[in-house]
């Protein structure tokens, strides 16, 4: 049995939905109860999602500040993102976050600033004919945006957008953030910078090789580890390079797979369904409580986000449920099956939650306050 009450803040009306087996009941403002009978679990999910989305489009919002771990704290309609990348910018030290979407036929790109309960603090028009692929929140109160392969800096105070790192579009960018560190690619060099202390941590000149794969133009990928001791990058077909950010030492891992991620303690690096010790690059057995399919290709789904010992893992398809694991004890804490994901979603941890930006045009927050 699942029941949720949505509130429309503009009209103060309530809308309630109840799912009992294969029966859906809805009720607007204490009026007549409508009953929908379904003949399968799939139909229940589909019709319930559709009913909730219909009300959310009218301004109804679901909020539950007392949600248990893995339960929804908020569902809100923001509007479909025309570019399909569903960018989010979060950080593990704060609960507020930023979501960007392209409105209409690239008429505008809108940046939303949400608080941890899902209230909109601010919306900013970034302008027409923009396409932000990804964005990160830096400790100096700026966002770095990858706008169609051009890195730009957005000030949260002045709302000014300025060019950052690469001045011309070379179809090659890297952008990642972990703690106070941010990683980016200038078109010639990978840079890791600490915005909290305003110091450069590491810099390396690399040339990204052209790709033979029709899905992307260049091998150009870089990421930081959860504890900020390592970086990983890929600029050629068959190998990843792991960098120790303190010593500058490098380990080369021969692997042409996809979907890399680090363990919460930075000791293991996984890519293409294989596992390696980050210090030596030696192969190792799977240290995680969840299995990972070997030989992961570009089009497969294996998305992993980390906060402390927590790992949010989505595998198989972009619409698959997200598993929330506690790696300190190997426990599966929750399985998040968001009703507003059609084919894919982007998700990221905040200080106490997991935020989803979905292709149905919704923003959901799930409680991860341990």
What residue spans do the PLM features occupy?
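Short aromatic-glycine-(Arg/Gly/Cys) micro-motifs in beta-strand/loop hairpins
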Residues: 10-35
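Blade-level signature of beta-propeller repeat domains, shared across WD40, Kelch, NHL, RCC1
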Residues: 342-370
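Surface-exposed loop/turn elements that mediate protein-protein interactions on large endomembrane-trafficking
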Residues: 71-80, 109-126, 149-166, 189-212, ...
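Repeated scaffold domains used in trafficking and secretory/extracellular systems
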Residues: 83-94, 127-140, 165-180, 206-227, ...
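Hydrophobic beta-strand positions that form the internal "hydrophobic ladder"
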Residues: 97-98, 143, 182, 231, ...
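Short, solvent-exposed loop/turn segments at conserved positions within beta-propeller repeat blades
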Residues: 103-108, 146, 185, 234-238, ...
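A short, charged, amphipathic alpha-helix used as a generic interaction element across diverse proteins
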Residues: 40-57
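Intrinsically disordered, low-complexity acidic/Ser/Thr/Pro-rich linker and tail segments
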Residues: 64-103, 107-108
